[in-house]
């Protein structure tokens, strides 16, 4: 059939996380607390790294960028989810859906590349400690961060450019709570088998490759640390363990969603909630609870703010 005869749908309807009103209220409270904690936790990391001069190192410079990404990434889906949990109708316009997918993959892609840059940073710190500050200069760190965002942009544009030309004539019901490629692609009024393979290659296989590359990289780093001794070795192992935990929590759901045929499974909703809303919360928790230097810096900043407040009152 000629694609010009198709009538493009004007909006999509979400089935949402649950159809139960009672459970919706419970989930609203839980996810609202998670989202607020995500914003405050990541914002606190940003402020601490910016205000504490002894944290002006490449590792914390990159960590601040990750916090910015986590705030933006969670804000792509969480506010809409919270609104829909209290709404009878859960709809989003076609243009709104495309916009959500664009920023979702832009920030998700930048997140993946940023985690790779952080692994490279740890490798240089362990393998070339005497030249670390020279190699990971402020200019180079900035360039790597910009490259991560550009990589996310290219990845997102590739997704959207493949999806936009497709005809969408109905149905318009998405069995999820946000717009993403696997669910939207299934609603196209044409054969999408080849396109699905391209999407799986772009998202899933790349996620697998980067995940294993990062695991191998951190394994090499940990093996290199066997020759180190003292407090520096303990701190380096703690930092690498935190990075490995964050990488695993990010990539396992990502691989589950994108590295398989785009067919709905009963566990999809739970995995998606973990991936989109809860994962950005875990990053600040992991990096602050396991990082004594960060915790000491936060206490120092708190004392400074307290002193400033007393001076203003006087």
From Swiss-Prot:
Disulphide bonds in the chain: 97-189
Localization annotation: Cell membrane
Transmembrane region(s): 26-49, 58-79, 101-120, 140-158, 196-219, 236-258, 270-289
GO-annotated molecular function: G protein-coupled receptor activity; olfactory receptor activity
Residue positions with a glycan: 5
Highest taxon listed in the record's lineage: Eukaryota
CDD domains the record matches: 7tmA_OR4D-like
Name recorded for this polypeptide: Olfactory receptor 4D9
Organism: Homo sapiens
């Amino acid at each position: 059939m000629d694609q010009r005869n198709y009538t493009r749908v004007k909006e999509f309807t979400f089935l949402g996380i649950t159809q139960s009103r009672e459970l919706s209220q419970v989930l609203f409270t839980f996810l609202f607390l998670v989202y607020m904690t995500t914003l405050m936790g990541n914002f606190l990391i940003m402020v601490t790294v910016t205000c504490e001069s002894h944290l002006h190192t490449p590792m914390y410079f990159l960590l601040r960028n990750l916090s910015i990404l986590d705030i933006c990434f969670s804000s792509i889906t969480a506010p809409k989810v919270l609104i829909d949990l209290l709404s009878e109708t859960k709809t989003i316009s076609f243009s709104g859906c495309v916009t959500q997918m664009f920023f979702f993959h832009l920030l998700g892609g930048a997140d993946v590349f940023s985690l790779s840059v952080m692994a490279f940073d740890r490798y240089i710190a362990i393998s070339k400690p005497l030249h670390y500050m020279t190699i990971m200069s402020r200019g180079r760190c900035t360039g790597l961060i910009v490259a991560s965002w550009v990589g996310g942009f290219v990845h997102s544009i590739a997704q959207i450019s493949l999806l936009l030309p497709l005809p969408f004539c109905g149905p318009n019901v998405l069995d999820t709570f946000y717009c993403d490629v696997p669910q939207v692609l299934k609603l196209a009024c044409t054969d999408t088998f080849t396109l699905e393979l391209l999407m799986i290659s772009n998202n899933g296989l790349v996620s697998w490759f980067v995940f294993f590359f990062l695991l191998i990289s951190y394994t090499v780093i940990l093996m290199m640390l066997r020759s180190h001794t003292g407090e520096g070795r303990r701190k380096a192992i703690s930092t690498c363990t935190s990075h490995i935990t964050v990488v695993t929590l990010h990539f396992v759901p990502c691989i589950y969603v994108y590295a398989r045929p785009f067919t709905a499974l009963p566990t999809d909703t739970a995995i998606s909630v973990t991936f989109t809303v809860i994962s950005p919360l875990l990053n600040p928790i992991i990096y602050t609870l396991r990082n004594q230097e960060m915790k000491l810096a936060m206490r120092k900043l708190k004392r400074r703010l307290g002193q400033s407040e007393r001076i203003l009152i006087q």
